[in-house]
Curated annotation (Swiss-Prot):
Protein's UniProt name: WD repeat-containing protein 13
Sites of Phosphoserine modification: S70, S74, S79
Modified residues (Omega-N-methylarginine): R114
Compartment annotation: Nucleus
Tissue-by-tissue expression: Widely expressed.
Keyword field: Acetylation, Methylation, Nucleus, Phosphoprotein, Repeat, WD repeat
A Pfam family reported for this protein in Swiss-Prot or TrEMBL: WD40
GO terms assigned for molecular function: promoter-specific chromatin binding
InterPro entries: WD40/YVTN_repeat-like_dom_sf, WD40_repeat_dom_sf, WD40_rpt, WD_repeat-ST_regulator
Organism: Homo sapiens
WD repeat residue intervals: 162-202, 208-246, 250-290, 295-335, 341-389, 394-438, 444-482
Modified residues (Asymmetric dimethylarginine): R114
Length: 485
């Protein structure tokens, strides 16, 4: 049963940064050996119920030993090492479509527990108020965590010293997406409508473009790093997705869109990086198995418009998709089969394209509810609360920005749970990068970075927030350096 052993390995990988923090080589050897043993045991034919029980017990034991997990990309997750996961995403996995063990005894598809988002806030508060000894949970007395975050106010913490570097290799063509590698301070990638993807290294100085990935015949609309940063997946207006090896830049596989439509966005399934979800111009989302190049059976659904944005919750059981008609759909993701079940629909604003969706399970000490950050062409940045296990959204507040036509994106800051307040960052058509405190009732603006000469389309923090990258519609990528306190 490939699905369960991949979930077990994903749990181990997420805790791997906390094992022997002074011996990163041991952590790497450990996770590789775990991957090997789990793959071997997957062929032993153990009863599915026994495997699921093992997964639950494994998660409970690791949680008791190391404490609650932080959000992916946070400084705690970084923990002195950029090695989080083995290179499992390049292994040949079993296709969910053809795996008879993904079926129950009578041939029915199994579903797994999806958890209750309705109880998520209560659970978070329970962890906060009744945490076990030795666990790492943000509190008002979390001096070490505050020190990691700078022990300063949000305004002071998000003061920037200026530009660290400017990349202009994609000048004259928009750069719709820029992303730091997972748990990495100095590795950056960006994609361009010129049809290429750049991999950049910021240290040692001077920053350099390591390689440019070429192969798409039209603009690259989106890309994503795998959990272990060994591969990237990209989507393009040429109706294909490509799988790239980040180490040498080679194209591992080219996968055509099942509908032969322009591909507009993509995201990895966070628990099983062998699966990638893509959205296209024919209003469809598809779950793709990147090892086989096939669409997963039952992993497709239709929206009301062109699919522009995708985001999973941290456990990988809820997927949100936004389209150019102003709707956001939630889907239940079956971990055992890869099947999508449409759950809820929210009309943000009829006819206003939803260009960005970011999910977060724990925003801050003051905002411990699962949240969704959404950009739509409304001249507003929207923050929603996730209120139940089907992804129902409730508007919490909005922030003024300029966005009426461009595909602007936004992010939650990776260290926000370690300090008083919580910050989000967004691009804007006024050519600025805006910072907002989601907990401040009045005057939520924290900072504004000026330097772009075109609408800012995307922003990305590295894992410790020492650097911020922003890209714009003219092809410029600016890396900003935060002031050291």
């Amino acid at each position: 049963m490939a699905a369960v052993w991949q979930q077990v390995l994903a749990v181990d990988a997420r805790y791997n940064a906390y094992r022997t923090p002074t011996f990163p080589q041991f952590r790497t050897q450990y996770i590789r050996r775990r991957s090997q043993l789990l793959r071997e045991n997957a062929k032993a034919g153990h009863p599915p119920a026994l495997r699921r029980q093992y997964l639950r017990l494994r998660g409970q034991l690791l949680g008791q030993r190391y404490g609650p997990l932080s959000e992916p990309g946070s400084a705690r997750a970084y923990s002195n090492s950029i090695v989080r996961s083995s290179r499992t995403t390049l292994d040949r996995m079993e296709d969910f479509e053809d795996d008879p063990r993904a079926l129950g005894a009578r041939g029915h598809r199994r579903s797994v527990s999806r958890g209750s988002y309705q109880l998520q806030a209560q659970m978070n508060r329970a962890v906060y108020e009744d945490r076990p000894p030795g666990s790492v949970v943000p509190t008002s007395a979390a001096e070490a965590s505050r020190a990691m975050a700078g022990d300063t106010s949000l305004s002071e913490n998000y003061a920037f010293a200026g530009m660290y570097h400017v990349f202009d290799q994609h000048v004259d063509e928009a750069v719709p997406r820029v992303r730091f590698a997972n748990d990495d301070r100095h590795r950056l990638a960006c994609c361009s409508l010129d049809g290429s993807i750049s991999l950049c290294q910021l240290v040692p100085a001077p920053p350099t473009v390591l390689r440019v990935l070429r192969g798409h015949t039209r603009g690259v609309s989106d890309f994503a790093w795998s959990l272990s940063n060994d591969i990237l997946v990209s989507t393009s207006l040429d109706a294909t997705m490509r799988i790239w090896a980040s180490e040498d830049g080679r194209c591992i596989r080219e996968i055509p869109d099942p509908d032969s439509a322009e591909l507009l966005c993509c995201t990895f399934q966070p628990v099983n990086n062998n699966l990638t979800v893509v959205g296209n111009a024919k209003h469809n989302v598809h779950v793709m198995n990147i090892s086989t190049g096939k669409k997963v059976k039952g992993g497709s659904s239709k929206l009301t418009g062109r699919v522009l944005a995708l985001s999973f919750d941290a456990p990988g059981r809820l997927l949100w998709a936004g389209d150019d008609r102003g709707s956001v759909f939630s889907f239940l993701f079956d971990m055992a089969t890869g099947k999508l079940t449409k759950a809820k629909r929210l009309v943000v604003h009829e006819g206003s394209p939803v260009t960005s969706i970011s999910a977060r399970s724990w925003v801050s000490r003051e905002a411990r509810d699962p949240s969704l950050l959404i950009n739509a062409c409304l001249n507003k940045l929207l923050l929603y609360r996730v209120v139940d296990n089907e992804g129902t959204l409730q508007l919490k507040r909005s922030f003024p920005i300029e966005q009426s036509s461009h595909p602007v994106r936004s992010i939650f800051c990776p260290l926000m749970s370690f300090r008083q307040g919580a910050c989000v960052v967004t691009g804007s058509e006024d050519m600025c990068v805006h910072f907002f405190d989601v907990e401040r009732a009045a005057k939520a603006a924290v900072n504004k970075l000026q330097g772009h000469s075109a609408p800012v389309l995307d922003v990305s923090f590295n894992c410790d927030e020492s650097l911020l990258a922003s890209s714009d519609a003219s092809g410029m990528v600016i890396v900003w350096r935060r002031e050291q306190k």
